[in-house]
Amino acid sequence: MIKKIGVLTSGGDAPGMNAAIRGVVRAALTEGLEVFGVYDGYLGLYEDRMIQLDRYSVSDMINRGGTFLGSARFPEFREEHIRAVAIENMKKRGIDALVVIGGDGSYMGAKRLTEMGFPCIGLPGTIDNDVAGTDYTIGYFTALHTVVEAIDRLRDTSSSHQRISIVEVMGRYCGDLTLAAAIAGGCEFIVLPEVEFNREDLVAEIKAGIAKGKKHAIVAITEHICDIDELAKYIETETKRETRATVLGHIQRGGSPVPYDRILASRMGAYAIELLLQGHGGRCVGIQNEKMVHHDIIDAIENMKRPFKGDWLECAKKLY
């Protein structure tokens, strides 16, 4: 019977992580469990930096961005002897299970702990919305709001100067955030990692828009596809239109979480405790069709893939 649990946040931070921690803590305490927060993710787990949390530890946290427990990259956690130390640190406190909030890299750490016999539950916390087994991740909707607001501001100045603007959006190798923001922001052109990119084709489309009387345009592109400063120079040379590139960067990860992220994080945190009390370990939580679901964390990492929203892209093209 589980009596004590740990909770940590790992990888890149996302708005709503604090709400998720709060959900875990409050639900666990309601069920009579003790909760330990781990500072700085797996690094803190290895370095034995933990603190017992009570209801007041998470007061006034639901509206705060970032993660008050901190997060850190710790690639050494892939080493078994490092994980063995982490498990021993938890066991000496009587911790029976661990809730991990983060992206697929964080899930990999939880998977490896599970394979060593220590039960973990993963919650999807990343603005990239690139975790399998869930329709949405904690932080995605807040980041979407931030990106759309930035696009709206860029449109104001692009319109004033009859300029082409390129805006680079986070997402790693998933275009969900870019695609949704582009539709909501009315972007004329969208470049995604799921679709082969050819800059000559993009310029041809921009020229076609200019020929139809288009005075300005916004190109939304997911990070890591190309150097957008070089792309801006190329577009300006080919179209003879002033072109500017904007990298939104880490501003997308910050800010107070929007209501949906607060609700999603709270539900997922409480559901993680429900699963642990039912004897589940090695699972990851998701939301599908607005219902809480859980999947085998190993299967989610190794076999499940997020479907590409091709119908969304086709819709966007009709609206150019």
Swiss-Prot record:
Pfam families named in the record: PFK
Compartments reported by the entry: Cytoplasm
InterPro entries on file: ATP_PFK (IPR022953), ATP_PFK_prok-type (IPR012003), PFKA_ATP_prok (IPR012828), Phosphofructokinase_CS (IPR015912), Phosphofructokinase_dom (IPR000023), PKF_sf (IPR035966)
Domain of life, per lineage: Bacteria
Residues holding substrate: 126-128, 163, 170-172, 223, 244, 250-253
Binding site for ADP: 22-26, 55-60, 155, 186-188, 212, 214-216
Record keyword Manganese present: no
Binding site for ATP: 12, 73-74, 103-106
Binding of Mg(2+), residues: 104
Gene3D superfamilies noted in UniProt: 3.40.50.450, Phosphofructokinase domain
Keywords for the protein's UniProt record, in alphabetical order: Allosteric enzyme, ATP-binding, Cytoplasm, Glycolysis, Kinase, Magnesium, Metal-binding, Nucleotide-binding, Transferase
Group of enzyme by EC: transferase
Family as reported in the entry's similarity comment: Belongs to the phosphofructokinase type A (PFKA) family. ATP-dependent PFK group I subfamily. Prokaryotic clade 'B1' sub-subfamily.
Protein name: ATP-dependent 6-phosphofructokinase
Organism of this sequence: Cronobacter sakazakii (strain ATCC BAA-894) (Enterobacter sakazakii)
